[in-house]
Amino acid sequence: KNAYENVKKYVDKLIKGTTNKGLFITGAYGVGKTYLASCIANEIIKNGKSVIFGTLIQLLEFMRDSYSDSEVSDKDHLNLYSSVDLLVIDDLGKEKPTEWVLEKLFLIVNNRYNNYLPIVITTNYNRNQLRERLCINKNYSIVDSIISRLYEMCGGIEIKDDDHRMSDSLIRESLRNSWYNRSISKITLDVKRLVADKNVTFLF
């Protein structure tokens, strides 16, 4: 069955509240993983839910910047990432992380796991490759904890070349009436406002 059809079914379940599982979207570079994750985010937003969408580095740069802002703490950011209705981390494994990044990623993933909240991940890598990409100095302990949690929380969909070639016509046909089918827009976050209003809908 085509990956796009499976994603549509997944989103329908999220909206109806019949699943709180997350989703791993894997595939080679350029097959449309980010676009598909954007479609998911837009549909969840359309149905009145809050979404954070960004790369891991983007997410944590906002947290790191809070060290110079006395009004917003890294704990505020952590709480946002842990409690938003849907968190989308795009292109996981692209950048080599630091120990600080892995520590924060584990806290976010573990908090969402404990709160029964979904997370969507896009990545070019399979499980073993992602393990190697995230590992620092052959210390696999925290990486294994992160990946184990993610795979326990998430189902998986692989986008192949055939799916990519079919994607334009299939999205127009199957998502025309029910999906908010437009490109996701990147906006600059007013973090102070977001911290004050935990129900705000926003995207990176």
Task: Give names to the regions the model predicted.
Residues 49-50, 83-86, 115-121:
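Loop/turn-to-beta-strand initiation segments
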Residues 35-48:
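P-loop NTPase Walker A phosphate-binding motif
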